[in-house]
Swiss-Prot record:
Role description: Required for the formation of a threonylcarbamoyl group on adenosine at position 37 (t(6)A37) in tRNAs that read codons beginning with adenine. Is involved in the transfer of the threonylcarbamoyl moiety of threonylcarbamoyl-AMP (TC-AMP) to the N6 group of A37, together with TsaE and TsaB. TsaD likely plays a direct catalytic role in this reaction.
Catalysed reaction, written as an equation: L-threonylcarbamoyladenylate + adenosine(37) in tRNA = N(6)-L-threonylcarbamoyladenosine(37) in tRNA + AMP + H(+)
Full protein name: tRNA N6-adenosine threonylcarbamoyltransferase
GO MF assignments: iron ion binding; N(6)-L-threonylcarbamoyladenine synthase activity
Keyword set, alphabetical order: Acyltransferase, Cytoplasm, Iron, Metal-binding, Transferase, tRNA processing
Keyword Disulfide bond: no
Organism: Kineococcus radiotolerans (strain ATCC BAA-149 / DSM 14245 / SRS30216)
Compartment(s): Cytoplasm
Entry-linked PANTHER family: TRNA N6-ADENOSINE THREONYLCARBAMOYLTRANSFERASE (PTHR11735), TRNA N6-ADENOSINE THREONYLCARBAMOYLTRANSFERASE, MITOCHONDRIAL (PTHR11735:SF6)
UniProt remark on cofactor binding: Binds 1 Fe(2+) ion per subunit.
Classification of source organism: Bacteria, Bacillati, Actinomycetota, Actinomycetes, Kineosporiales
Cross-referenced InterPro entries: ATPase_NBD, Gcp-like_dom, KAE1/TsaD, Peptidase_M22_CS, TsaD
Cofactor(s) for this UniProt protein: Fe(2+)
GO cellular component, one term: cytoplasm
Length: 347
């Protein structure tokens, strides 16, 4: 069975083809440069870019896989969450393709795709694991069982900014480029992560154990920089970037390891765009090794949004015998995560 996956939840247009847990081919187009001058993603710009890119990207993915559309057995698509107009472009394209081919359509949850993509690199997921999903729009700790069949348990989420969003905003304060994650990562290489003690929110005993908050550290950086400039001093960009990055990585990895311990699982899955950050990865490796946990992190190119991850979760659903979604499937920009299928657990 060959599953074609379509991703369009934000600013990447992705198509991937997966069969039996093996990535056959994928392609990606990004409208990131078009958003750079705005300092963030503009939904209508993203949607227009998806419209222009979806067909060429699909042909490129098929070409890499050495396949034709006639070889596709099922279509999976991100039906939420995400930017409304962006999600709708991918969903409409996937519906049209499924209808034209007479193949089943599976509307999947974007975050389940991030978890499923690791299967393409490291094989089947452990029977139970904790997933730390960290991106521009999401920061969540999830307890996973059988990803295709079981309910996904939310252990905690951010109560304000996602980690990736905080990276973008701090990068803007420091005059670095967009997107902020890679810019801060590069700047931090020459900095001292202990130079400035930025706050670690929700770290007290009485705070939610697995809740996150990055609005405070973002504001703390802005105020520190403003005070330095008002005093006529030069802003040590590398030190600020490294200290901010350390604060975020510390909270993310500490809470993720604690979740594994408390729930009796021995594997941590680190996924999402921020999983590409070198300090987050390094600290996760260090803390998982100390705790005797297996750490699974997809290749960097599969950490950010892509079509392969949607094909991967679609492949799991097809092999598990999940019911198809049907062509009346609607987009849900704020879809709650209860299962890999947007409609929730089915078994």
């Amino acid at each position: 069975m060959i599953v074609l996956g379509v991703e369009s939840s934000c600013d990447e247009t992705g198509v991937g083809l997966v069969s039996e847990g093996v990535l056959l081919g994928d392609a990606l187009a990004s409208s990131m440069d078009a958003h750079a001058r705005f300092g963030g993603v503009v939904p209508e710009v993203a949607a227009r870019a998806h419209l222009e890119a979806i067909v060429p990207v699909m042909h490129e993915a098929l070409g890499k896989a050495g396949l034709d559309l006639a070889d596709v057995d099922a279509v999976a698509v991100t039906a939420g969450p995400g930017l409304s107009t962006a999600v709708q472009v991918g969903l409409a394209s996937a519906k049209a393709l499924a209808f034209a081919l007479g193949k089943p359509l599976y509307g999947v949850h974007h975050l389940a795709g991030h978890a499923a993509v690791d299967v393409l690199e490291h094989g089947p997921l452990p029977r139970r694991c904790v997933a730390l999903v960290v991106s521009g729009g999401h920061t969540s700790l999830l307890l996973l069982g059988d990803l295709a069949r079981d309910p996904i348990v939310h252990l905690g989420d951010t109560i304000d900014d996602a980690a990736g969003e905080a990276f973008d905003k701090v990068a803007r304060v420091l005059g670095l480029g967009y997107p902020g994650g890679p810019s801060i990562d590069r700047a931090a290489r020459d900095g001292d992560p202990r130079a400035i003690a930025f706050p670690r929110a929700l770290s007290r005993a009485q705070d939610p154990a697995y809740g996150f908050s990055f609005s405070g550290v973002k504001t703390a950086v802005a105020r520190w920089v403003e005070a330095r400039q008002d005093a006529g001093g030069e802003v040590p960009v590398a030190d600020v970037a490294a200290s901010f990055q350390e604060a975020v990585a510390d909270v993310l990895t500490r809470k993720a390891v604690a979740a594994c311990r408390e729930h009796g699982v021995d594997a941590l899955l680190l996924v999402g765009g921020v999983a590409a950050n070198t300090r987050v990865r390094a600290l996760a490796e260090q803390r998982c090794a100390a705790a005797g946990l297996e750490l699974r992190v997809p290749p960097i190119r599969l950490c950010t949004d892509n079509g392969a991850m949607i094909a991967a979760v679609g492949d799991l659903l097809v092999r598990a015998g999940a019911p198809a979604s049907g062509l009346d499937l609607g987009a849900d920009p704020s879809a709650p995560l209860t299962g890999a299928l947007l409609a929730g657990p089915w078994s």
